[in-house]
């Protein structure tokens, strides 16, 4: 993922795929990839399914800079994850069942399905508002435990991995396992 042209095209592809899969509405969610000097991330206000050129993404460093004002509001969260891991890519999405489960569960979502248990283990739920140090610290702490994905309570999921396909698969699995758990719990009432 070293070529900037390839990077924005990869971000555009996976942004469209997230939206068409129902894992985000087109306006919400973020995608980034690690670069040699930092990360490339969607610009603020750009819809995930409407990334059409390199101008729709921006490269920023791993530490705050003047470019942060035009980068995604989730840039601090992405930085925190990159600084805490060796991840090469991150997807932040708003999968509905994962968000619901984050409001119903205490500290983690425990998958019940035979795919989610070995693939995800448990999914930590972290608190903190978008762009806050609290969220950044909680994400870094959760990722230091070696998890594949984390859900920010009432907000959305973060998946960090080796590439955007890996992150997409984790995001889809978090949503699938959350949906199965929600429906199972509902049926048992």
Regions inferred by a protein language model and the residue ranges of each:
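Glycine-rich flexible loops
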Residues: 1-189
């Amino acid at each position: 993922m070293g070529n900037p042209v390839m990077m924005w095209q990869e971000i555009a592809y996976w942004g469209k795929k997230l939206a068409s899969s129902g894992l985000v509405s087109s306006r919400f969610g973020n995608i980034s990839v690690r670069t040699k000097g930092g990360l490339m991330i969607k610009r603020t206000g750009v819809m995930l399914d409407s990334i059409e050129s390199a101008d729709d993404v921006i490269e920023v460093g791993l530490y705050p800079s003047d470019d942060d004002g035009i980068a995604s509001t989730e840039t601090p969260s992405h930085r925190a994850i990159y600084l805490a891991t060796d991840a090469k890519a991150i997807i932040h999405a708003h999968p509905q069942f994962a968000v619901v489960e984050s409001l119903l569960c205490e500290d983690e979502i425990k998958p019940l399905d035979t795919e989610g248990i070995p693939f995800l283990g448990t999914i930590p739920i972290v608190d903190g508002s978008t762009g806050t140090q609290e969220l950044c610290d909680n994400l870094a702490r959760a990722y230091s435990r070696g998890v594949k994905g984390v859900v920010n309570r009432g907000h959305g999921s973060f998946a960090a991995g080796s590439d955007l396909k890996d992150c997409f698969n984790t995001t889809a699995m978090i949503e699938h396992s959350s949906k199965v758990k929600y429906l199972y719990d509902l049926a048992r009432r």
